[in-house]
């Protein structure tokens, strides 16, 4: 049974911010792209359909036939049952369980402590503590002792871990290779995801019903949302709504605020059904909280109901005006910011989006909005879909970069990468052919960026990665900018340039070899002792897996034959070979390189291995492959 609240009477607040949007009849004009603003110093619970249950890899199958050992099992169970009634045994068991609970609480405290310290050792200690907590949670006797606070604390630790791991991953300055085994963020992410799924599974299976509350569920749902576990979220929620004991918890405002946008995005419910759920669950409330108002505003904007979205924004503003405690006011401000960003990134009416965008970059708001790059990415994509002129798109792009440059705190490295990738994806769609206009516009964009901040590797990598013109000369001019602007390069830029040669037929094998050698030289100068998988991938995409593989296949095989022993180790070799085994079209060709007999390849140039200081042979490729074949 959906239990909801009654919203209070019609709001009367009409801030200037909203009036300008509602009363705008003449459109919102765009300045030139260079005009960048300056910064100051009928639904019931019975209609819910439950999908399939969470599955566990270690769960027992139901309905197994009785085995011959069942009588023995029965005797053991009988013995244990009688033993449990013994006071001494019971006391010992209680003491053991108490020790387990104390250990669990100690680990919770440690996790909070480690998470508050931002250094490498604390991150590793947190991961170890999280692993201890996850293992401890496997104990049913421990779970039986939990009170609401214990479950809440664990969910809180998970949510904190998910958020911090994501932040660390996005802010990392290092370009990690996929074959660097010490990628701890990836390891931690897998650990966190497993822990989140396990907790969701336990709750779905009916545990913790007596102690489950909305704050705990909120943390769990937020964690699941970060991992984009949308089907699992919807299933968990629908399963809970239909439970007589816990149904009301799942209809709490805070829970609806998290789950309703997901059900709309995943097409589980229509916009009208979402409104009906909202109305049923809010008709008896004196006021609706800012979290749910924000979510409903977001859904309304996504559905094109901008008037209701503005109503939600006004209602949140009213809550802010009436709020007394500063802590609560700050939470409301966060909701205002969140909904404001939705008008920028989700609204399909670019005039409305621009109005809200300008309010942020001109700092013309009674509340602070942190301009998040996914919303700008979405805005640029919406502009393209609405066939906005390129100059309008450039206005948003350049104003965003200028805005980020004014921020005092460290800007995440991923922010510019996402923003630039969105721009150049659109640029090469709008200008699919090289001509005077398109080339001039590209040069203009590069000059714009250089005026805003120094040309960097990520910027040039993004242009080259999206480059789609059939001109080797122009591509080489772009590549020259690494030197022109004294860009500090990482192995990534060399791989991007090498891979892009696979898109242009005009590159000869000799020119591709030059880029391969340049990449290896950089690796050697940076004390790499092996050729990473990422470099092998760039080479194959430029040659044997390119559109021009017939002319480049033998060249690739020749290079592979010369450098095959430079693969990192046994593990990387297995990974390398298994990739090619799946490619039936070239598997036989690759197998030639592993032949114990010398092979001759029909290559038009000679492949010579330079003298390296650090790069070296790490494996015997032929023996490795032979051992793999022998072991099956």
Swiss-Prot record:
Residue range covered by the transit peptide: 1-23
GO biological process entries: sporulation resulting in formation of a cellular spore
Biased composition (Polar residues): 53-69
Residue span of region Disordered: 27-69
The record's account of how the chain is modified after translation: Phosphorylated. Phosphorylation promotes binding to RNA.
GO cellular component: mitochondrial inner membrane
Subcellular location field: Mitochondrion inner membrane
Keyword Glycoprotein: no
UniProt keyword Transmembrane, yes or no: no
Swiss-Prot/TrEMBL keywords: Membrane, Mitochondrion, Mitochondrion inner membrane, Phosphoprotein, Sporulation, Transit peptide
Topology relative to the membrane: Peripheral membrane protein
Signal peptide: none
Superkingdom of source: Eukaryota
Low complexity composition-biased segments: 34-52
Family stated for the protein in its record: Belongs to the RMD9 family.
Subunit structure and binding partners: Monomer.
Cited function: Binds the 3'-UTR of mitochondrial mRNAs. Involved in the processing or stability of mitochondrial mRNAs.
Name of the molecule in the record: RNA-binding protein RMD9, mitochondrial
Annotated organism of origin: Meyerozyma guilliermondii (strain ATCC 6260 / CBS 566 / DSM 6381 / JCM 1539 / NBRC 10279 / NRRL Y-324) (Yeast)
Gene behind this protein: RMD9
């Amino acid at each position: 049974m959906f239990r909801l609240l009654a919203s209070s009477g019609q709001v009367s607040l009409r801030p200037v911010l909203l009036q300008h949007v509602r009363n705008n009849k003449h459109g919102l004009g765009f300045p030139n792209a260079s005009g960048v603003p300056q910064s100051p110093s009928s639904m019931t619970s019975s209609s819910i359909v439950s999908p399939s249950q969470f599955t566990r890899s270690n769960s027992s199958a139901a309905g197994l036939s009785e085995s011959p050992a069942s009588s023995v099992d029965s005797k053991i169970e009988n013995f244990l049952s009688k033993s449990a009634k013994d006071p001494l045994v019971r006391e010992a068991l209680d003491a053991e369980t108490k020790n387990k609970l104390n250990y669990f609480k100690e680990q919770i405290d440690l996790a909070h402590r480690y998470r508050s310290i931002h250094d490498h050792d604390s991150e590793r200690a947190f991961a170890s503590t999280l692993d201890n907590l996850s293992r401890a949670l496997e104990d049913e006797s421990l779970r039986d002792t939990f009170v609401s606070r214990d479950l809440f604390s664990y969910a809180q630790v998970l949510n904190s871990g998910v958020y911090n791991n994501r932040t660390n991953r996005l802010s990392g300055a290092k370009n990690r290779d996929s074959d660097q085994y010490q990628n701890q963020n990836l390891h931690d992410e897998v650990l966190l995801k497993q822990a989140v799924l396990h907790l969701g599974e336990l709750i779905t299976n009916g545990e913790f019903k007596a102690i489950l509350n909305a704050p705990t569920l909120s943390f769990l749902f937020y964690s699941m949302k970060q991992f984009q576990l949308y089907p699992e979220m919807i299933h968990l929620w629908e399963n809970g709504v239909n439970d007589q004991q816990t149904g009301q918890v799942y209809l709490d405002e805070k829970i609806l605020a998290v789950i309703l946008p997901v059900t709309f995005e995943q097409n589980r419910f229509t916009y009208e059904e979402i409104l009906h759920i909202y109305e049923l669950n809010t008709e008896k409330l004196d006021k609706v909280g800012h979290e749910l108002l924000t979510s409903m505003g977001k859904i309304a904007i996504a559905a094109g109901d901008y008037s209701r979205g503005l109503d939600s924004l006004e209602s949140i503003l009213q809550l802010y005006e009436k709020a007394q405690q500063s802590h609560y006011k700050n939470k409301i401000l966060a909701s205002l910011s969140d909904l404001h960003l939705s008008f920028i990134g989700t609204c399909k009416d670019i005039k409305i989006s621009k109005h809200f965008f300008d309010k942020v970059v001109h700092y013309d708001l009674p509340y602070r909005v942190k301009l998040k790059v996914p919303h700008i990415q979405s805005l640029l994509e919406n502009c393209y879909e609405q066939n906005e002129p390129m100059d309008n798109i450039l206005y948003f792009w350049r104003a965003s970069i200028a805005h980020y440059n004014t921020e005092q705190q460290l800007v995440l490295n991923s922010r510019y990468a996402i923003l630039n990738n969105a721009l150049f994806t659109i640029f090469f769609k709008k200008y699919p052919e090289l001509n005077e206009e398109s080339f001039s516009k590209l040069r203009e964009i590069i000059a714009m960026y250089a005026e805003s901040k120094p040309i960097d590797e990520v910027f040039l990598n993004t242009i080259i990665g999206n480059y789609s013109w059939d001109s080797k000369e122009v591509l080489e001019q772009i590549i020259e900018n690494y030197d022109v602007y004294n860009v500090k390069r990482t192995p990534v830029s060399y791989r991007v340039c090498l891979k892009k040669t696979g898109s242009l037929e005009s590159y000869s094998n000799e020119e591709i070899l030059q880029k391969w050698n340049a990449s290896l030289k950089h690796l050697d100068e940076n004390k790499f002792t092996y050729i990473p998988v990422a470099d092998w991938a760039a080479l194959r995409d430029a040659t044997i897996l390119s559109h021009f593989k017939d002319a480049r296949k033998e060249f690739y095989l020749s290079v592979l034959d010369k450098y095959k022993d430079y693969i990192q180790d046994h593990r990387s070799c297995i990974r390398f070979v298994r990739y090619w085994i799946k490619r039936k079209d070239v598997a036989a060709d690759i197998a030639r390189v592993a032949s114990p007999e010398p092979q001759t390849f029909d290559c038009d140039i000679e492949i010579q291995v330079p003298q390296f200081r650090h790069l070296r042979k790490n494996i015997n490729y032929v023996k490795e492959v032979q051992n793999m074949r022998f072991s099956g």
